[in-house]
Amino acid sequence: MRILISPAKKMRVDGDSLAPTALPRFLEEAEILKNALTGLTAEERRRLWECSEAIAQVNEERLRLMDLFHAVTPAILAYEGIQYQYMAPGVLERKQLDYLQEHLRIGSGLYGLLCPFDSVAPYRLEMQAKLKAAGKKDLYDFWGGKPAEQLAAETDWIVNLASKEYSKAVWPHLPRRVGFISCVFG
């Protein structure tokens, strides 16, 4: 079984609490997307990010400093959304962290699919963003079936806790043998 969750918009760098154990599996694709972002003007990025000028400035700096191959924060600590706060990975014991590493997967506009201890750099790129990269019209087109194929290679059952935005990147591409149970919170 794998549990699929969405990332959070707010991110942080934490190189002290827990160390990442791996690079994201779709790092080459993330590099393509990073290059597509840097190929846009600052105003085009702000429109793509759909954010205020202040938030755009923070993310401009993050993009300028981004080193995908030497990030120091594990994904489980990088996101600051409410689900990550309540998961409280900073206080979990080793056995619990190992369970998360085996069973939890995080959808990502930039990285495609992450394990909790994959190293990530702070970024802003939602799956629904209309970023054109590698001849593809948007991120759904860019990622295609890669996240779903990876999940299908790992399990026969997915518990979907992700938003529609992120589950849409997985569900249509799964083989029929993989069960997909969605939990709707409302």
Which positions does each model-derived feature cover?
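Internal, well-folded beta-alpha domain core
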Residues: 89-186
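Short hydrophobic beta-strand segments
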Residues: 2-6, 157-160
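Active-site helix-to-loop segments that bind/position phosphate- or nucleotide-bearing substrates
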Residues: 4-91
